[in-house]
């Protein structure tokens, strides 16, 4: 089953991504309320720090980039990219602890947080076109164009369950 938590624009508008703190009903079997509250509040704070243009790290990163004609980003990397990598690892760790798969927040364009339960009988019809093709056996990451809405979620599957799952706990 796919659980999609869409971005909440009422908190910060479009300055930086934030997600609602509501407890998602489909995840109750996997995550308790306290763990969810800690996760979502920490995630929102990390996203604010990473995307807020007026944070100290982002200001220093921008000034250093301009002064070095953006060479510093290639040599040292940017603080923003490091923070986004840490956020991806934080989400991955949370999903792993609670026996869930998660789509990379970067691949989802920071518009939605998508979890997939590890039930073998529930697959999304949008994640694969032909499960018996050889390419299906080598899929290790979630395609970036996949979205899960109520119109394209399939909770049952007619193909073999011994094929590898197309969702992985990986970040790109």
Curated annotation (Swiss-Prot):
Its main location: endoplasmic reticulum. It holds the Pfam family Erf4. One of its GO terms (cellular component) is Golgi apparatus. InterPro entries: Golgin_A_7/ERF4, Ras_palmitoyltransferase. It is a peripheral membrane protein. GO terms for biological process: meiotic cell cycle; protein targeting to membrane. Keywords: Endoplasmic reticulum, Meiosis, Membrane. It is found in: Endoplasmic reticulum membrane. Interacts with erf2. Belongs to the ERF4 family. This is Ras modification protein erf4. It comes from Schizosaccharomyces pombe (strain 972 / ATCC 24843) (Fission yeast).
């Amino acid at each position: 089953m796919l659980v999609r938590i869409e971005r909440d624009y009422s908190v910060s508008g479009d300055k930086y991504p934030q997600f609602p703190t509501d407890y998602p009903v489909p995840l109750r079997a996997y995550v308790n309320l306290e763990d969810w509250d800690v996760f979502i509040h920490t995630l929102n704070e990390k996203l604010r720090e990473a995307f807020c243009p007026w944070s100290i790290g982002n200001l220093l990163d921008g000034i250093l980039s301009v002064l070095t004609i953006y060479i510093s980003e290639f040599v040292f990397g940017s603080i923003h990219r490091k923070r986004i990598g840490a956020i991806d690892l934080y989400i991955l760790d949370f999903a792993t602890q609670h026996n869930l798969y998660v789509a990379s927040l970067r691949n989802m364009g920071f518009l939605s947080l998508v979890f997939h339960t590890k039930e073998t009988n529930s697959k999304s019809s949008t994640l694969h076109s032909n499960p018996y093709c050889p390419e299906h056996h080598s899929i290790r990451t979630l395609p970036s164009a996949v979205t899960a809405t109520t119109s394209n979620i399939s909770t049952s599957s007619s193909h073999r369950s011994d094929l590898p799952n197309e969702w992985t706990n990986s970040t790109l």
